[in-house]
Amino acid sequence: MTNTPPTPPIAPCQEGFVETPEVRLRYLTWGDPGATPLVLLHGIGQTAHTWAYFATAMQDHFRVVAVDQRGHGDSGWAPDGDYSAAAHGRDLDALILQLRLEEFALVGFSMGGRNAMWLTDRHGARLRRLVIVDAGPQRPHATGSSARQFMSGPDVLDSVEDFVERAVRFNPRRSRETLRESLLHNLRQLPDGKWTWKYDPVLRQPSRQTTPAGDLWSVLAKIACATLIVRGAESPALPEEQAARMAEVIPNARVVTISAAGHTVMGDNPIEFEAKVKPFLVEKNTAG
């Protein structure tokens, strides 16, 4: 039996869709529609529901918008298999335009963190605050191997519980109940009664799990808004040295580390994640 942290409650949310020239994007919202928007971007193989606990914690202060990025959750799959940062960027441009996000805060995890970094290059003037979660311009090989290890397992199993068992073995930091809740939003049942992932199988290919070459360091140097860099204490994804360099390159940034957390920081230790990230976001929001 694992000593997992307590799980916060989840509030109900609303569902919406944005039509882009390439895919249909599904998003979830919490909070007052008139409040400052807070956009949340998940990692590879995840869904908008990844953020449910954190979104619940933020709904009294923001209009929270969590997106199923292309190829994930209930959003459309890329017709040409394009899951590059540029493709994600086009989708997010459409989301920002159609939801009329004149000014917003942005939080991105892993793949979503890198997509968030690229987004600052085009929408920096709109950003109130930025949170980059366990993602950096350079990805250690250990991270890619770990992610691919989980995604490269069997993609069809007899039951949801079979997926839960596999997830428990892969990430013992989280309770069976929280893993099941997360998986239920990330699985679909096949006509023969078996279960498989919602995400596009193309994403299981290692070559599709990387963003295209580009100098993210130069992008970081131009970020004008206050930035919080969050890393998991037990995660290989964002080494202390790289996080420290990011904080030096970004003009107004600092680093926080979440204890008892691997790569999926906000799910492994949601209480501490909220305690360290919420004040950073709310401070600017209440300042007007």
What is the meaning of each model-derived region?
Residues 252-288:
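Catalytic active-site module of serine/aspartate enzymes centered on a nucleophile-bearing elbow/loop
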Residues 87-104:
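Conserved acidic catalytic loop of the alpha/beta-hydrolase fold
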Residues 102-141:
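Conserved hydrolase catalytic core segment
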Residues 190-248, 254-257:
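Conserved serine/cysteine hydrolase catalytic core
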Residues 1-38, 60-62, 101-102, 278-288:
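Alpha/beta-hydrolase fold catalytic core
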